[in-house]
Regions:
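Core AdoMet radical
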Residues: 1, 16, 178-201
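Flexible loop/turn segments at secondary-structure boundaries
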Residues: 1, 32-34, 126, 140-141, ...
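Glycine-rich beta-alpha loop elements in corrinoid/cobalamin-binding modules
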Residues: 1-112, 116-123
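Alpha-helix capping and helix-loop boundary segments enriched in small/acidic/polar residues
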Residues: 3, 24, 158, 162, ...
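Conserved, mostly hydrophobic/aromatic
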Residues: 22, 133, 167, 171, ...
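Short, charged low-complexity linear segments at domain edges
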Residues: 129-156
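N-terminal pre-triad scaffold of radical SAM enzymes
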Residues: 150-172
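Cys/His-coordinated zinc-binding microdomains
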Residues: 175
């Protein structure tokens, strides 16, 4: 969706427009990625995969008219936002409001002759799902591309342990609620202690 780019100091169209990706998965991607892989394994053509929660894709106004849902939220178009910053602010308000709902609506935004479609998110993970997600053999190391470079933030988080996902906040300086959702999903005590033990060994 239309967003402010700090480096270029201007509003940019949705990432789908510039990347030309077939689909984007937003937020924490375990559930949507599994759903996408399951559809592809069944042989569903990629062009027909439109309803997976927590995904976004490009469509056309004609196609969206045929697939309209009663509670769809139609944002001001990208072009309208370029002309009026208050319209962009109103769009952002809708996005924030939907991120605070357990049952959010689908969000649509016209950009030129295309429509960005953002499906609502999955419900928060259960404790068991979150435990399973943290049970993979993560290395706890920086990405290999840094090749021995000093990463000051890594020193701070090297031994940190996530005990939950999500944040009900929405602080201007932080994007955790945008990435992880506004609802808290907690790990079990056993899962947390298992990770702490692994770090200390």
């Amino acid at each position: 969706l239309t967003h402010y780019d700090y480096w270029q100091d201007k509003l940019k169209p949705g990432i789908l427009i510039e990347s030309r990706a077939d689909m984007l998965i937003y937020g924490m991607g375990e559930k949507p990625l599994r759903s996408l892989v399951a559809e592809l394994k069944k042989g569903t053509p990629f062009s027909e995969i439109k309803s997976i929660p927590q995904t976004a894709y490009l469509s056309t106004p004609k196609d969206m008219a045929q697939m309209a849902l009663e509670d769809d939220i139609h944002l001001f178009s990208h072009e309208e936002c370029l002309q009026d910053k208050l319209k962009q602010a109103k769009n952002f308000r809708h996005i924030e409001e939907e991120s605070n709902k357990m049952e959010a609506s689908r969000i649509l935004q016209i950009v030129g002759d295309e429509v960005i479609v953002v499906n609502p998110p999955f419900p928060p993970m259960t404790e068991a799902e979150l435990d399973a997600s943290f049970d993979y053999p993560y290395t706890r190391l920086p990405h290999p591309k840094y090749k021995g470079k000093t990463i000051s933030a890594f020193d701070m988080i090297q031994y940190s342990v996530n005990i939950h996902r999500g944040c009900f906040g929405g602080c201007a300086f932080c994007t955790i609620s945008a990435h992880q959702g506004k609802f808290i999903a907690s790990r079990s005590k056993q899962s947390i202690l298992k990770e702490v033990k692994a770090i200390t060994e």
